[in-house]
Amino acid sequence: MRLTKKGGQDMDTLKILVVDDESRMRKLVKDFLTKKNFQVLEAGDGEEAMDIFYKEKDIALIILDVMMPKMDGWEVCREVRKNSKVPIIMLTARGDERDELLGFDLGVDEYISKPFSPKILVARVEAILRRTGQTGAEDVLSAGGIVIDKAA
């Protein structure tokens, strides 16, 4: 099944910002997301993430680490929430219950502790995008060359 944005655009037009100070982690997440035709933007710290977030007006979702130099993930989340309701997934080694609860208090949509399954991460990304109405996946199905538009 192929996910599309409302209006029929492919998901490859959806931008996901991946923020982690470890380049290997960003590459791993990016590889799995690009296989699903997402466009991935990367930031190595919180300040860079905020620069990209304000420059790119159409970011569909943010995947955010907590422990980073310059500006941590908590502060990035606070700043983003001042101006936007863009979905945020925390992807972090901080698996303590207090950290997870703090994330939800700050407005994250999902909290995933490392180590994690990249396939589950992608499934959660797709589920959040469907729930937030950024895709019309429930309206348009495509399988074996057959396209069904439920809204038609």
Indicate residue ranges for each PLM-predicted region:
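Active-site residues of response regulator receiver
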Residues: D20, D65, T92
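Charged docking surfaces used in two-component/phosphorelay signaling
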Residues: K27-K35
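Acidic, metal-coordinating helix/loop segments flanking the phosphotransfer/catalytic sites
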Residues: E42-L61
